[in-house]
């Protein structure tokens, strides 16, 4: 068991586009809390269904997540899975006991728990991680980063 682990199996999911400090915080907490961690990364088709534009390809996002997990020395206890919908494997895996989310995705975790109850699975403990803010007090987000990359910094040289 890892020193800070409180749960046997933790799940966390997301698009993880342009892996930023907010993602890293979410993943770090999941790694701290779980003996085993399932990380769901949204597939390209799910990203399209959600109407997101300019998102890095699935394999690139998985590589970034895998690299982060390796840097944390946690590869041996992490499973990275494709996320085809909002629920991933949370409605099928009765060994999961916690889910790590942002305030933005907390409603999905509540929905997951309701669906788990209906299937006879125990609800997941929901761990909500506050947003990481930039120097201006704004939420760090992939959509903002995509916008800044698309527009680029304006410089008069």
Swiss-Prot record:
Catalysed reaction equations from the record? (R)-4'-phosphopantetheine + ATP + H(+) = 3'-dephospho-CoA + diphosphate
Q: What is its main location?
A: cytoplasm
Offer an example of a GO molecular function term for this protein.
ATP binding
**Lineage: superkingdom:** Archaea
Report the EC code(s) recorded for this entry: 2.7.7.3
Keywords, sorted A to Z: ATP-binding, Coenzyme A biosynthesis, Cytoplasm, Nucleotide-binding, Nucleotidyltransferase, Transferase
From the record, give the transmembrane residue ranges.
Answer: none
Question: Which Gene Ontology CC terms are recorded?
Answer: cytoplasm
Task: Give the subcellular location.
Answer: Cytoplasm
- Pathway noted in the entry: Cofactor biosynthesis; coenzyme A biosynthesis
Per the record, the GO terms for biological process are: coenzyme A biosynthetic process
Identify the InterPro entries for this entry. Answer: Archaeal_FAD_synthase, Cyt_trans-like, PPAT_arch, Rossmann-like_a/b/a_fold
Q: Does the keyword Nucleotide-binding apply?
A: yes
Concerning SUPFAM superfamilies, the annotation shows: Nucleotidylyl transferase
Keyword Transferase annotated: yes
Outline what the protein does. Answer: Reversibly transfers an adenylyl group from ATP to 4'-phosphopantetheine, yielding dephospho-CoA (dPCoA) and pyrophosphate.
* Matches recorded under NCBIfam families: cyt_tran_rel (TIGR00125), PRK00777.1 (NF001985)
Listed name of the protein: Phosphopantetheine adenylyltransferase
The organism is Methanopyrus kandleri (strain AV19 / DSM 6324 / JCM 9639 / NBRC 100938)
């Amino acid at each position: 068991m890892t020193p800070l682990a409180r749960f046997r199996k933790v799940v966390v999911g997301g698009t993880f586009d342009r892996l930023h400090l907010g993602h890293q915080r979410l993943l770090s907490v999941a790694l701290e809390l779980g003996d085993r961690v399932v990380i769901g990364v949204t597939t390209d088709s799910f990203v399209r269904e959600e109407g997101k534009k300019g998102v890095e390809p699935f394999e690139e996002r998985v590589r970034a997540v895998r690299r982060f997990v390796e840097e944390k020395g946690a590869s041996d206890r992490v499973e990275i899975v494709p996320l085809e919908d909002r629920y991933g494997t949370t409605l099928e895996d009765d060994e999961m006991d916690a889910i790590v989310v942002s305030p933005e995705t907390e409603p999905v975790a509540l929905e997951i728990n309701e669906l788990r109850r209906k299937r006879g699975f125990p609800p997941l403990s929901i761990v909500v991680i506050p947003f990481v803010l930039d120097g201006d007090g704004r939420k760090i987000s992939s959509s903002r980063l995509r916008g800044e990359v698309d527009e680029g910094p304006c410089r008069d040289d």
